[in-house]
A protein has these predicted regions:
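Outer-membrane beta-barrel domain signature, strongest for Gram-negative TonB-dependent receptors
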Residues: 1-106, 112-117
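Solvent-exposed loop segments that connect transmembrane elements
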Residues: 1-20, 63-79, 121-194, 232-288, ...
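Membrane-embedded beta-strand positions in outer-membrane beta-barrel channels/transporters
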Residues: 33-35, 89-93, 194, 203-211, ...
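Residue-level signature of outer-membrane beta-barrel architecture
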Residues: 39-42, 86, 96-98, 208-213, ...
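Repeated loop/turn-to-beta-strand initiation elements of outer-membrane beta-barrel proteins
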Residues: 44-47, 102-103, 218-220, 307-310
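Short sequence motifs at beta-strands and strand-loop junctions characteristic
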Residues: 17-18, 26-30, 82-86, 189, ...
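Membrane-embedded beta-strand positions of outer-membrane beta-barrel proteins
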Residues: 49-51, 105-109, 222, 298, ...
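Transmembrane beta-strands of outer-membrane beta-barrel pores
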Residues: 42, 53-57, 111-115, 226-232, ...
Length: 327
């Protein structure tokens, strides 16, 4: 839809795009970080410190429908499909030997703090209303389609409102159906003004990993880790698509009428596509979660010859949950 046919014959990774004039794919990305590892030797014991910090920010405007028809877009602002995060980590480890080298031991602690923000500003373009009104008009009767009219019907609406036939096409519901189509056709540059999602994560852990040389050929490895993680979430929404609640209130009563439900449902769905509605305007959400877990591993390995290793192992892993940073 809306693409120059020449684009279909070009190489997958080297081809021209034909976006809506005036829509931009301008974006900006910043990514940097620093890490440091320091080791101190104290005879048979080594202390290791690993510190890391990373910061990333990205936003990307787009002609989101990727066609010359202005259906969906993201303006190239700081809210355009933006991803920002800052992460700080610190790990401390002590390692050493005991019992004449029969035990290699390790104990440690870990801390991480991450702040993540996701933003978006996806909006309906200036031709969305006309485009989806034509979809409805085609579903009603392709012969009545007039793409030059804003509601894709124009004067042909007389064939539906009873002016020509004396019998309205949808009975007593006809005025509401036609009003819903007109409302749908009016969608132009509406939708998300901004969506902002924030998640802050704080994680700390204590761990140990030890290898016991039972004999010269038989080793037992035991590891244990305790992890505690807290995540705090909040989100705020700004949306100016008033057509969605208007058409839902206007046509929602017809969803229980079998002969009208498909048409009424189609108009409502296209009015609220992507859950875009002004009912979200000013809405804010908050939540939090805390988890703690023990994980570990146990491995028994036997090396009967220099070229053969036989082992059995058990391990239990864990990954903390989080929040979906979108709708």
């Amino acid at each position: 839809l809306g693409q120059d046919p020449r684009a279909l014959t070009q190489d997958t990774f080297n081809r021209d795009l034909y976006p809506t004039p005036g829509r931009s794919y301008e974006g900006e990305t910043e990514d940097y970080g620093i890490s440091a590892e320091i080791n101190w030797d104290f005879g048979n014991v080594t202390l290791t410190s690993i510190t890391g910090y990373r910061e990333y920010a990205n936003s990307q405007g787009s002609d989101t429908d990727y066609t010359t028809v202005d259906i969906l877009y993201r303006a190239p602002t700081e809210n355009a499909l933006a991803r920002d995060f800052e992460t700080f980590t610190q790990e401390l480890r002590l390692t050493g030997e005991a019992f004449d080298g029969k035990l290699d031991w390790l104990i440690g602690a870990y801390y991480a703090n991450e702040e993540l923000q996701v933003r978006d500003n996806l909006r309906f373009g200036t031709q969305y209303g006309n485009f989806v009104a034509c979809r409805i008009a085609i579903a009603i009767n392709p012969a009545l389609v007039n793409p030059g009219a804003s509601n894709c019907l124009g004067a042909n609406v007389a064939a539906l409102d009873g002016t020509l036939t004396g019998s309205p096409a949808f009975g007593a519901a006809t005025p509401a159906i036609l009003a819903g189509i007109n409302n749908l056709a009016s969608i132009s540059d509406l939708g998300t003004v901004s969506e902002v999602y924030n998640q802050t994560s704080e994680n700390f852990a204590f761990f140990t990993h030890n290898i016991f040389a039972i004999t010269d050929t038989l080793d037992l490895t035991l590891g244990l880790r305790y992890t505690n993680e807290t995540k705090d979430f909040d989100a705020t929404f700004r949306n100016d698509n008033t057509v969605c609640p208007t058409n839902r209130n206007l046509l929602g009563g017809f969803l229980g009428v079998p002969t009208l439900a498909p048409l009424a449902g189609g108009i409502i769905s296209l009015s609220c596509q992507g859950n875009s509605t002004s009912e979200l305007d000013g809405v804010s959400l908050e939540d939090s979660r805390e988890e703690e877990e023990f994980t570990g591993t146990a491995i028994l390995s036997w090396k009967p010859t220099p070229d053969l290793l036989v082992y059995g192992s058990y391990s239990r892993g864990y990954k903390a949950g989080g929040f979906n940073l979108d709708r």
